Amino acid sequence: MGFCGDEPFTVWHNDSGDFSKCFEDSVVMTLPAIYLLIFGMKRLYYLENKKPDLFTLKQLSQDFQTWRKTLQLEVIVSILLVAWKILFFIVIVSIYNKPFEILYSVVTVVQWTVSLGLVYLEMKKGQSRSWEIRLYWVFAFFVATVKLRTLTLAIAGKSIYNVGFLEYFSYFVGYCLILILSITSVLFFDNLESYQNLEENEISKEVNANLFSRLTFWWINSVLVKGHKKALEISDVPTLGEIDQSILLSEKFEKAWEEQLKKPNPSLPWALAKAFGPHFYIAALFKIIQDLLIFVGPTLLKRVLGFVESRDGSQDTYDGLIYALLYFLAPVVQSLLLHQYFHRCYRVGMWLRSAVVTAVYKKALKTSLREGTTIGEIVNLMSVDAQKFMDLCPYLHMIWSAPLQLAISLVLLYRILNASVFAGLGIMLVMIPINLAISNLAKKRQTISMKLKDRRTKAVNEVLNGIKVIKLYSWEQSFMDHVNEIRNKELDVMKAIKYIQGFSLLLWSMSPVFVSVSTFTVYILTGQVLSATQAFPALSLFNVMQFPINMLPSVVSSIIEASVSVARLQKFLLKKDLDPNVVEHHINEPGIAVKIDNATLEWEPNKPILHDINLTIKKGELVAIVGQVGSGKSSIVSSLVGDLDKTKGTVAVNGSVALVSQQAWIQNATLKNNILFAKELNQDKYQSVVQACCLEPDIKILPGGDQTEIGEKGINLSGGQKQRVSIARAVYNNADIYIFDDPLSAVDAHVGKAIFKNVLSNQDGILCNKTRILVTHAVHYLPYVDRIILMKDGRIVEEGDFNTLIEAGSHFTELMSHDEQQQQLQQQQAPDKSSDSNEQIGGGDNKESENNEEQNEEEEGENENLLEKVLRKSRSRSPSPSSNRNIDGDDIASGSILQTTRTPEEDEQDERELMEDIDIDGGENIQTPLQKGEKSSVLKQPLRLLKKLPTSINKKLNNSGSGVSLKPITTVNAKPQDKNKIISVETKQEGKVSFKIYLSYFKAIGVLLATCIIGFYVLTQLLSILANWWISIWTNSYGGNGNGSGSGSISLSSSSTVEDNEKAKYYLSIYVAFSCGTIAATFLRSFSMVFGSIKGSKLFHEKMFKAVILSPMSFFDTTPIGRILNRFSKDQLTIDESIARTLGMFLNTFCQVVGSIIVIAWVSPFIILAMVPVGALFYFIQKYYLNSSRELTRLEGVSRSPIYAHFSETLAGVTTIRAFKDVARFVTENERLLDENQKCYYINISSNRWLAIRLEFLGACLVSCAVLYTVLARSRIEAGTAGLVITYALAITGNMNWMVRMSCDLENSVVSIERIQEYCLLPSEAPLFNDKSVPMSWPSHGKIVFKNLWLTYREGLDPVLRGINCTIEPKTKVGIVGRTGAGKSSLTQALFRLVEPLRGTIEIDGIDITELGLNPLRSRMAIIPQDPVLFAGSVRYNLDPFDQYDDHEIWEAIENAHLLKAIKDLDGGLDAMVQDGGDNFSVGQRQLLVIGRALLKKANIIVLDEASSSIDIASDALIQETIRTKFADCTVLTIAHRLGTIADSDKIMVLDKGELIEYDSPSELLKNQDSIYYSLVKASESKQNIDNDDESN
């Protein structure tokens, strides 16, 4: 007896058409056991090795009663089922003895026992029910149904097998138990883990969704309902589950990537596959089954048409009804499987993006940006390249799925059309090498395209970072040309790629036409008759082939693009990290904080910047590092925080490090949070730090106090305020070692001394017991430090304390002598002191005068009295023609102070205000923290001199914050009512995308071209319909000649006439003509769309960039750079690559749907009755979905901007972040922002699946109705007509689905146009040019007249300049001073028209500047800003972007800027490249280059905003001399932090709260002891004297 007993092993029983009993029991019934063996063992291994969770069944609260009861039911049913299966086994063994029957019974008992074991373990470990068990129960139920059917037929006597009642009853009871388990698995599901990490209101419904809900995406209904009722907000979107969160995904990827890094050739794709592959591979199972179900329709079509042709009643109507039912069930199951596949793939794509973005972010924090990767490139890696991965994932399986579908199609076609199918196969084989060649061409250009995208993004980023300088220099046009030049190159390459892709797509999309034409031609020419049962199933298969054929080139193209992105990402991730061991963190020698031993360090390989450095710093020591510009001071700092590569020696620090960079790094956060820097608040410590850093007065006048939001890069703080916040952050950090990289250069002299005393000094400084390293150019601090390190050419040339170095002479003496030389140069016209001046100054208070005299005697030869120096310098100059004029031009008796009637109360109030805030720049005050009981000797003297100050300078600070240099001009989405906030919240449009947005795209393409494109799509569909309609006529013309049985084809009989043959050729020729017309129309539509999309992309980018660069400064002050970059990267990418493709697919499907409706209505009007309600439901579902999808897309776009903003902010402060060892916090914030963005994307893609399933369900209903109609009307309809109806019904299902989805995708994509259009319509500054012309020599004199000038930054804020009236005569040198919010910067902005006047005018050489275009105004003046900005490009480009000057003039300017040697030493000289932001130059060298710009410009009006703050004393002396000589015939306005800088000015302008308080020569102002200028000079001198007293004591 064999395995099957007496029967042979066969699959089918020939008599009944059912499975044979042996095959059913031994194969079909064991399939669930095989599934359980594969997946159950995996789950068993996991459970055995997992520790129990914190909660078990007994620990669950009342909230989990559903889970508890379901679990109890499942356990009880599983036990009963195992017991019953054992009983069933006994029954089977007692009745049967065949091996396959015994095997079946044993396998059944074992598999259910294993299932029970898994259920028990999951309960014991506190785990949610696994998908492996749930799917097993559902699978087992369906398989058990097959067995039950067999037994039911047998017991009913309709089978050849005999079944007893006992066997049937025992099986039926087991079947009912399986049914219970499958129902619980489908309807009940609680994910216990979700309750551990999330609040109840944050939990996504998906977490606890049952199987039915997951299959149909019912769980997303709650979000869609909310979105239908109102515009969704970010808070309405559920939080990502733990499996989707960036932190977990990053850990998985890092683990896989670390394994790859151990290999000789690390592979990023393999790392991603290792981390996320399993989930992706499981999706392939769904795809395989779905691919097989695709062919149910064509197979059934042949049977349906055969049924229609069998009018003789040989086939029962019941068979036709079964066909109609199958036409409904197969697409529904296919849809459920397809969208589970898509959902998994999209989810994996989202995971890949999270992992890649996080990896790039972390890598940027670990590598040096001097390695050659620009910020623009890194932004593209995060936006464009990561997006390529995400876009590819859903279609990557088509690489094997498409060939599989094509192979099955060809096999089925062969069965229908015999060997003629090989003609079509030959066409396809010919296309493969052609498309491979095309793909290679596309790949090469894709690499170039990505590089150009990087260059463009980098250029735009540079423009945004340097926009203020660009506007001040009127360089907008130059940078527009520069960016547009790169963009045009990018578009040229993109155009080539699109034409290549268009040609490839044309070949593939037309291949079904080629295949059908060639196949039918060969079929007819071989003498065959084409019947309806052959033609329409064949056409249906050709339609099936169309999708994989269309998708294959797109997927190949996407793979090519992704491979380019992989290479770029892999190259970046493989960049060398900064060596974490370059700085050792342990020093064996006790009492040593820093030790550098014989170290040579470099920024770039083989280009050392520091040579043989030997440096030892003791704990608690205060060390100053000095030297000329480019000597290596900042490089020493960089070496201590690990930014430099070490080629030899050792660098070691013992303890934590806090860094204050030379250029202050400020976060977009509140002032308080900037200081705390995520440290826990200690109020007393915080207050003392704020006081020590002289920030208290600033906090008092900020609109929100220390809760005021600081804009991006500290936009609403002055340079001094930013630097003091930076110092406060470091001090609060409580580190062991503090490194100050010349931060005091940004503050005025007396505030710098106050900070030095309060923070750094060995006597009273908060950090007196800490190790302090101070890089400085201010030599007056050097006597008070423990040790001085002198750098020159990257080497330490001298070292010691102040006195030792002075006695030793050499380099240090030379450095100190420069200060004296500078003073002597300024004193050449007045070598002697003025006794008159001394008497005048001394007339204030006798006691204080005596003290000052004693101090001056002690300091004689070391420190000159600043008041005397100012008087001497001012007296030495010729008196200005207007020196005795009033501000308005009228004579007044008391110099230039505006007198008003005052009361004693006002005087007292003024004294209190001045005690708190005597300031001459953006917030620099002289208040110092005093110990309890300490006398305020610091402020006593100046206060006594200021008792009679006028009331006009001491008005109370208003609540609007106008006393602070906030510049929130009204801009897009600004919220002026919130005065604590500077950065506007990015909002989104709500509701349906306006038709104007679509119209703007068509206008960008060109109305005529857009009309032609639409016409070509209509023509293509019309010709396609005519071809199919002709097939229907063709097949109907043969009447009953077709073989209705569907056995294949019939040959022409011997009686066939030549006429019949000619008739077939006639029909074939017309069909070929229509097909050729379709090909031609497709060609025209494809290439016209490419041409139009390129034209539209170019126009949108140009308009947006022009609108952005011409926007007022207020826009940039309130808009983060990351938000703007988002428009230029992701949104522009959507217009470049997505919209045209999506629009084309929508137009195509729309034409197909309309065409199908026309054909169906024409052939069978009755089906319209079914189409009306189905169409209505289509519309309702689409509208219901679109309300939410549209808002989710907008939210996804809005939430993407903070990622880029955070990234840009991080890169700007990466050195500080690394020094503070705070990398982990910033990584966590990046992950949080990424998750906020991804949750919108995830819900959006899930809603897409929700939509598709419902639309395809309606489509299945429509097809079923069409088949039902043909079945019921077979007596009145021809087979060819029926084939046409069903073919178009099948087509309209998919097409209507795709049309709705493409319309939704199109609207979602058009959101990018909406966002770009928003920027295209930004309000602009005044035009660069207008009708008003001025001579080329204007301004020839440089006379400036302010007439009643009022200025406000935006409507609703108080004016920042109030009635300024004064005249600056030609060639006058004016020093501008004032305290916080005085209006100094506002005056400069008004002069350059960065802000337009509220009222009043400014005239230059008699011309009202508001009548001029901005270009002639700004380009005829020169400004040297405090923050030097350089752009990537050559040195020549940075000095002369318009190529206006020859090499001789440029070299002369460089020489006068004292940078000649540094530039000549560069490879390439003037053509040497400047890195992003000038990173390959020191800050001082950057400042000198900026001075070179002004020298090259040769303007008659020069504005200096602390032009030499970052320059050493020696260079400063030379620069000051250059300014005096080269700008001698110019009008010069100098905003001063150091009073010495303006001591020799012709006039001093004192501003306070927007009012001009004093305007006269320094000598005249110093004669009046009540003048503010006198008090400032005296205060500075007093502070210096007190410091000297403290030192001597």
Swiss-Prot record:
Q: Where are the transmembrane segments?
A: 27-47, 75-95, 100-120, 135-155, 169-189, 280-300, 318-338, 392-412, 419-439, 505-525, 1005-1025, 1064-1084, 1157-1177, 1251-1271, 1280-1300
**What's in the GO CC field?**
membrane
Composition bias type Acidic residues, residue spans? 851-865, 905-922
The residue ranges flagged as biased composition, category Low complexity, are 877-886
> Mostly located where?
membrane
Q: Which PANTHER family match?
A: ATP-BINDING CASSETTE SUB-FAMILY C, MULTIDRUG-RESISTANCE LIKE PROTEIN 1, ISOFORM I
- What is the protein's given name? ABC transporter C family member 8
